[in-house]
Amino acid sequence: MTREFNQEVDWLVAGTGVGGLTGAVVAHELGAEVLVVESASVYGGTTAHSGGVAWIPGHHLQSLVGIEDSKEEGYQYLRSLIGDTVKEERLRAYADKADEMLQFMHKHSRVTYTPLPAYMDYYEEHQGAKHGGRSMCPGAFTLRQLGEEAAYLRRGPFEGLGMPFSMTVVESSSLMKMNLRSYLIGAKLMLRYWLDIPSRLK
């Protein structure tokens, strides 16, 4: 069955992963009329199945984790790792504007990120690599903030494993250590889930 749809907008976003929705937020805040389209019956894309970590070199929060980093070092790492397969202006744009994007989202959305001091760059042998602090962990986000739209959100990977809730990267890393702290975090997650009766009834 073919459905006709005709609407004129300033900014059309195809897909509801982190890239598309971030672009939609920016366009909306800049005054554009935005339309987001998604081919699936749920939104979130492959981002909904990821840990949500963002790699931001030279960000404004580096003092919180005691690192010294720069956008130039971030560019050097990308160039050393990727080589000539990506144009220089694209790599420069990412290294130079990633923190600007982060600050914009902190100001204009409910999304929050904190740096992970022990989350090192994957390829330490490359020029410009850092031992930690560039990877940013998204903060916990309750589905209640989404209202009725929560019913259409693609569920995360943990729910497919019989776990009816999601967790942050910090929480999941702590659980893997199998020590007293990990058991306490596991208990906190379960308690948070069971006490959140409104969300469980949806």
What do these predicted regions represent?
Residues 1-8:
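A short, basic/flexible loop-to-alpha-helix module at the beginning of a structural domain
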Residues 2, 16-17, 40:
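Alpha-helix N-cap/helix-initiation motif
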Residues 7, 27, 34, 58, ...:
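General secondary-structure edge motif
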Residues 11-36:
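N-terminal Rossmann-like FAD-binding beta1-loop-alpha1 element of flavoenzymes
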Residues 39-202:
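Conserved N-terminal/central alpha/beta ligand/cofactor-binding core
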